[in-house]
């Protein structure tokens, strides 16, 4: 009898390596793996070979860096997307892209199932499941880690018993997720929120530079297009900024996060490029957006980040918010100067042909063009409602 097929999102890590054998043994399925290159910086050929050696029917490896940046990271930059105003959503942004290609590969191969290695406590299970169901409601989803209830130690034992090579030891039980936009580290001592993270968990943010330096990022309609006066594609800009800012130790995040599933968790992230780009983008927006638009956009940015974090990328609400965000970027064009320091950075300059900053109006020096005479009438009209309220004794209640 012909076996049914399952397409597994495969990272080469502990959970998904064990999942290959588990899906074969538990469900008697032919396993097809999908590995996407979104800037992890790992040897994808080795991962493909590893999957094939574990007996999969096919092992797909797709370079999706350009699509990841164009369709997910750039919209997030335009939206200054930071969950709880801290986390730039590197992992969350990648999940709808993975879901999209799980569906695509499943349809191409006539697979009835898709599978992933997300845990039953995390957010990623929601993001992948919702993404798949939004695009292909008929596909069935298997989440082995959610079903088998292995502890980390039991999972390692299973791998050893089944001759599955794994990049995890009992001395280093960290779960790591990485892409162009950031790196997350979980597990082990990090689960104690009082304990300082060991220095050896950090790879992108090593403190190597002590002397201050300056960088300049040029944006066109909200998109970074130049770094230090040299035009580059966004992938290159992100890669270079991860190295440059990371060498100052910039981009570390140690955060108690409110997960979608209702628990609080201690999250460690590295995101040098994401933090610098978003802060520079915000600084440029401060210069070019009218006040009411700037203030309202800030409120919607929080909701946008929540929707992405919650796995609602394909939701009409997120898409409607994206249309708003895109419109706000019509004049977000200009240059931002950033000073890099050990462990920190500052926005120290910005310029734009659409700047609403007028030196003549803003200066307190002689030659100011601001009409102070107009201020009296403005104040009267602006405070008219409060004035009338006070006349009626409203403040005496």
UniProtKB/Swiss-Prot annotation:
Compartments, record wording: Cytoplasm
Any single GO BP term: L-arginine biosynthetic process
EC number: 6.3.4.5
Single annotated GO MF: ATP binding
Top EC category: ligase
Annotated positions binding L-citrulline: 87, 123, 127, 175, 184, 257, 269
Binding-site list for ATP: 9-17, 117
Keyword set, alphabetical order: Amino-acid biosynthesis, Arginine biosynthesis, ATP-binding, Cytoplasm, Ligase, Nucleotide-binding
Binding site for L-aspartate: 119, 123-124
GO cellular component: cytoplasm
Primary site of residence: cytoplasm
Domain of life, per lineage: Bacteria
Pathway note: Amino-acid biosynthesis; L-arginine biosynthesis; L-arginine from L-ornithine and carbamoyl phosphate: step 2/3
Catalytic activity: L-citrulline + L-aspartate + ATP = 2-(N(omega)-L-arginino)succinate + AMP + diphosphate + H(+)
KW Nucleotide-binding (keyword) present: yes
Claim: Amino-acid biosynthesis is one of the keywords in the record: yes
Family membership: Belongs to the argininosuccinate synthase family. Type 1 subfamily.
NCBIfam families attached to this UniProt entry: argG, PRK00509.1
Subunit structure: Homotetramer.
The protein, known as: Argininosuccinate synthase
Lineage start: Bacteria, Pseudomonadati, Dictyoglomota, Dictyoglomia, Dictyoglomales
């Amino acid at each position: 009898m012909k076996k049914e097929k399952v397409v597994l999102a495969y990272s080469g890590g502990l959970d998904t390596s064990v999942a290959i054998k588990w899906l074969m043994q538990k469900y008697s399925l032919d396993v097809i793996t999908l590995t996407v290159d979104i800037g992890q910086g790992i040897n994808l050929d080795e991962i493909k070979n590893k999957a094939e050696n574990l007996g999969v029917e096919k092992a797909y490896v797709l370079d999706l860096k350009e699509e990841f940046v164009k369709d997910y990271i750039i919209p997030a930059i335009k939206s200054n997307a930071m969950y709880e105003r801290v986390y730039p959503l590197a992992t969350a942004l990648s999940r709808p892209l993975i879901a999209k290609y799980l569906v695509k590969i499943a349809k191409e191969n006539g697979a009835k199932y898709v599978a992933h290695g997300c845990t039953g406590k995390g957010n990623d299970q929601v993001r992948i499941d919702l993404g798949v169901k939004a695009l292909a409601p008929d596909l069935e989803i298997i989440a082995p880690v959610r079903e088998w209830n292995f502890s980390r130690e039991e999972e390692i034992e299973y791998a050893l018993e089944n001759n599955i090579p794994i990049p995890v030891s009992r001395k280093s039980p960290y779960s790591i997720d990485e892409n162009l936009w950031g790196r997350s580290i979980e597990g082990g001592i990090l689960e104690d929120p009082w304990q300082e993270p060991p220095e050896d968990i950090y790879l992108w943010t090593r403190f190597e530079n002590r002397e201050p330096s300056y960088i300049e990022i040029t944006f066109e309609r909200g998109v970074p297009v130049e770094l230090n006066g040299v035009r580059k594609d966004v992938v290159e800009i992100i890669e270079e900024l991860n190295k440059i800012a990371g060498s100052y130790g910039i981009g570390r995040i140690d955060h108690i996060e409110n997960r979608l599933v209702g628990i609080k968790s201690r999250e460690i992230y590295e995101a040098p490029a994401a933090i610098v780009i978003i802060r520079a983008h915000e600084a440029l927006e401060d210069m070019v957006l009218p006040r009411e638009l700037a203030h309202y956009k800030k409120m919607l940015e929080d909701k946008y980040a929540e929707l992405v974090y919650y796995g609602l990328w394909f939701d009409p609400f997120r898409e409607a918010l994206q249309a708003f965000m895109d419109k706000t970027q019509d004049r977000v064009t200009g240059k931002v100067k950033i000073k890099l320091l050990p462990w920190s950075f500052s926005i120290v300059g910005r310029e734009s042909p659409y700047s609403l900053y007028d030196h003549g109006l803003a200066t307190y020096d002689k030659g100011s063009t601001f009409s102070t005479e107009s201020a009296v009438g403005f104040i009267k009209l602006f405070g008219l409602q409060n004035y009338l309220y006070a006349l009626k004794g409203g403040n005496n209640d």
